[in-house]
Swiss-Prot record:
The gene is gatB. One of its GO terms (biological process) is glutaminyl-tRNAGln biosynthesis via transamidation. Heterotrimer of A, B and C subunits. This is Aspartyl/glutamyl-tRNA(Asn/Gln) amidotransferase subunit B. It catalyses: L-glutamyl-tRNA(Gln) + L-glutamine + ATP + H2O = L-glutaminyl-tRNA(Gln) + L-glutamate + ADP + phosphate + H(+); L-aspartyl-tRNA(Asn) + L-glutamine + ATP + H2O = L-asparaginyl-tRNA(Asn) + L-glutamate + ADP + phosphate + 2 H(+). InterPro entries: Asn/Gln-tRNA_amidoTrfase_suB/E (IPR017959), Asn/Gln-tRNA_Trfase_suB/E_cat (IPR006075), Asn/Gln_amidotransferase (IPR018027), Asn/Gln_tRNA_amidoTrase-B-like (IPR003789), GatB (IPR004413), GatB_C_1 (IPR042114), GatB_Yqey_C_2 (IPR023168), Gln-tRNA_amidoTrfase_suB_CS (IPR017958). One of its GO terms (molecular function) is asparaginyl-tRNA synthase (glutamine-hydrolyzing) activity. Its EC number is 6.3.5.-.
Length: 485
């Protein structure tokens, strides 16, 4: 039997406000345990929550960026459950009327054969809520500690429709969402610190069946790799269970990175188990049209708009445009290179950024802002490739690594001169070298004339070797073809 995977994601993005959502306490990460927990965060008697306007503005920004509806009136509700790191015994969230409704995010997904396809993921909602504290299970022998510094940190919970059909689609969506919230500046996106974490709702059903299967929710996935591994394992587990004649039970599960497996944590609750009701301590949130329009006017150029511009203005593919706009800084670097190198170098600039530059950044674990090669320096190198001063191969193998290492101040011209890397420009000298190569490789000449194309490549290789790689490969090809008739 063929199976179809159905996936929906719930993502918690910590909003980048200086203070918590209902108190003035700092949200700075890394403070000593329980030093950033006010009476409001601790749920002490006689205190009332006060909504952080900055958190609301960030929610509006996100809603506008995904083309969603901003609710003119939304309501905060109490989500009732008991857990040691939840001091009040309830979490302030939004239930019936969230601040953001609907919206879409378009993603580029890599298929099984390496091709890319586009897909639009529909969002159900995004709502404001407070984060819980943190349980410290490994800090005390035989006991669990509680750190309430995180309690009350503003969260935007972003919920999709069950639109994704593979782990690859889920990861592509999570990466696109991560890129967007960081681009907007509403979340720092630090997954190691828990600023951006995903819950995946996964089910399977026979291919062609309309009804959804029973879902299991994988909680707190804080890396894209774990998200992919968890979904892939869970899918295979569910299929095996059904094929063995067992029923899937709705449950909340955890992913163990050590074993690569999911394991049930508890029976999955439904909304009625949380006994939602409007929080009597908070007035309904009212957002008028003028507030929304002011926020709209302050939005930066969004990734989707920039991607469309890169395709139309620079002739890039949709995949290239998406890759180059992964972060605002990466996109800005690219545009700075093209501004210096000219529009004719738009595609080569994209190739260099996605190739050699990205490889160096990944190897050293640094962001584009910290790259030792400036946009102007890379533009100069592209110009030298374009005018034939150096070949693309020499630029990659010899010039760029020296620029990255800071040799000669990262100046491409100085490095080319110092290393003697300039391509041969004397046609007469090159013709003489090719004549010598043909004379010394009579057998290859005969094989080529007998129809063996590989022999021609061998002659090109000998010519490049004789010039120590300084000849222009295109010119070598042209002269060889001319002389071989």
């Amino acid at each position: 039997m063929q199976w179809e995977v159905v996936i929906g994601l719930e993502t918690h993005a910590q909003l980048s406000t200086a203070s918590k959502i209902f108190s003035g306490t700092s949200t700075a990460f890394g403070a000593e345990a329980n030093t950033q927990a006010s009476p409001v965060d601790l749920a002490l008697p006689g205190v009332l929550p006060v909504l952080n306007k900055g958190a609301v503005e960030r929610a509006i920004q996100f809603g506008l960026a995904i083309g969603a509806t901003i609710s003119p009136r939304s309501v905060f509700a109490r989500k009732n459950y008991f857990y040691p790191d939840l001091p009040k015994g309830y979490q302030i969230s939004q239930y019936e009327i969230p601040v953001v409704q609907g919206g879409t995010i378009t993603i580029q997904v890599e298929g099984r054969k390496g091709e890319f396809y586009e897909k639009t993921v529909n969002l159900t909602r995004a709502h404001l809520e407070e984060d819980a504290g943190k349980s410290l299970h490994e800090d005390f022998a035989g006991m669990t500690g509680i750190d309430l510094n995180r309690a009350g940190t503003p969260l935007l919970e972003i919920v999709t429709e069950p639109d994704m059909r593979s782990a690859a689609e889920a990861v592509a969506y999570a990466k696109a969402l991560h890129s967007l919230v960081v681009w907007l500046g509403i979340c720092d996106g630090n997954m190691q610190e828990g600023s951006f974490r995903c819950d995946a709702n996964v089910s399977v059903r026979p291919l062609g069946q309309k009804e959804f299967g029973t879902r299991r929710e994988i909680k707190n996935l804080n890396s894209f790799r774990f998200l992919q591994q968890a979904i892939e394992y869970e899918v295979q587990w569910q299929i095996a269970e059904i094929e063995d004649g067992r029923k899937i039970q709705q449950a909340t599960v955890l992913f163990d990175p050590e074993t690569g497996e999911t394991r049930a944590m508890r029976t999955k609750e439904d909304a009625h188990d949380y006994r939602y009701f409007p929080d009597p301590d908070l007035m309904p949130l009212e957002i008028d049209a003028s507030w929304v329009e002011r926020v709209r006017g302050e939005l930066p150029e969004l990734p989707v708009a920039m991607q469309a511009r890169f395709v139309s203005q620079y002739g890039l593919s949709a995949y290239d445009a998406t890759t180059l706009t992964a972060t605002k800084a990466f996109a800005a670097y690219y545009e700075a290179v093209v501004a210096d190198a000219g529009a004719a170098n738009a595609k080569p600039a994209a190739n260099w950024l996605m190739g050699d530059v990205a490889s160096q950044l990944n190897r050293e674990g640094i962001a584009i802002d910290a790259a030792p090669v400036t946009p102007a320096q890379l533009a100069r190198l592209l110009a030298r490739i374009a005018d034939g001063t150096v070949s693309n191969n020499t630029a990659k193998k010899d010039v760029f690594p020296a620029m990255w290492a800071g040799e000669h101040g990262g100046d491409a011209d100085a490095i080319i001169a110092a290393k003697g890397l300039k391509q041969m420009s004397d046609t007469g000298e090159l013709e003489k070298i090719i004549d010598d190569v043909l004379a010394a490789n009579a057998r290859s000449v005969e094989e080529f004339r007998a129809g063996k194309e590989k022999a021609f490549n061998a002659l090109v290789g000998q010519a490049m070797k004789a010039t120590k790689g300084k000849a222009n490969p295109a010119q070598v090809n042209e002269l060889l073809k001319k002389k071989l008739g």
